[in-house]
């Protein structure tokens, strides 16, 4: 179940870029809460607190209770913008969560038992093909990450989305045959396989060649009688 975090906000009047710049100069980040068939509410949050939340990771999959004028709004971040030069937040959007509402989120993939995989023990490398998975779930059921157990993967093997057990109440929006992880062979692995395959073939060829070579011996010996047959034809002794 998702952990709900607290975040304090202050209502701000709707305004243009000038009002937003004034908020930033005061150390606050302008934002908005919208959704659930209710009017949007313009807010501002403390710059330091928001930056810490973003840097902590998984910001866009974290549920917040935003406290505003004594009331709490259950929300999930939908977007945020950073200053292109100084890399600090300059705007944030929150989606208001109604009861039982289904939320689409992108959740990171975490690996389990990677070092115990047979392919890794044989020198292979884990290659993460898909880093995030698109899911749909109720707000309280959104997982912080999806765990993929790769303990059975050998060199050349792959793990697909269909091999992963999703938490209860969570549905994937991606293809079931989506490749998540593969084990890449080490350098020179293909040459080793060729050499291993060539070894038995060469061993089988050697015994077959031996009889062929031996078969020539009788043929060579067969010529000996022919040479000996000429011996009686030597000149006879002259008569006196």
Swiss-Prot record:
Annotated stretches, region: Disordered: 1-23, 207-240
Function field: This is one of the proteins that binds to the 5S RNA in the ribosome where it forms part of the central protuberance.
Keyword rRNA-binding: yes
Keyword list, A-Z: Ribonucleoprotein, Ribosomal protein, RNA-binding, rRNA-binding
Any one Gene Ontology BP term: translation
SUPFAM superfamilies, per the entry: Ribosomal protein L25-like
Domain of life: Bacteria
Primary gene name: rplY
Family note: Belongs to the bacterial ribosomal protein bL25 family. CTC subfamily.
Gene Ontology cellular-component terms listed: cytosolic large ribosomal subunit
GO terms for MF: 5S rRNA binding; structural constituent of ribosome
Subunit field text: Part of the 50S ribosomal subunit; part of the 5S rRNA/L5/L18/L25 subcomplex. Contacts the 5S rRNA. Binds to the 5S rRNA independently of L5 and L18.
Classification via InterPro entries: Rbsml_bL25/Gln-tRNA_synth_N (IPR020056), Ribosomal_bL25/Gln-tRNA_synth (IPR011035), Ribosomal_bL25_b-dom (IPR020057), Ribosomal_bL25_C (IPR037121), Ribosomal_bL25_long (IPR001021), Ribosomal_L25_dom (IPR029751), Ribosomal_uL5_bac-type (IPR020930)
Protein name as catalogued: Large ribosomal subunit protein bL25
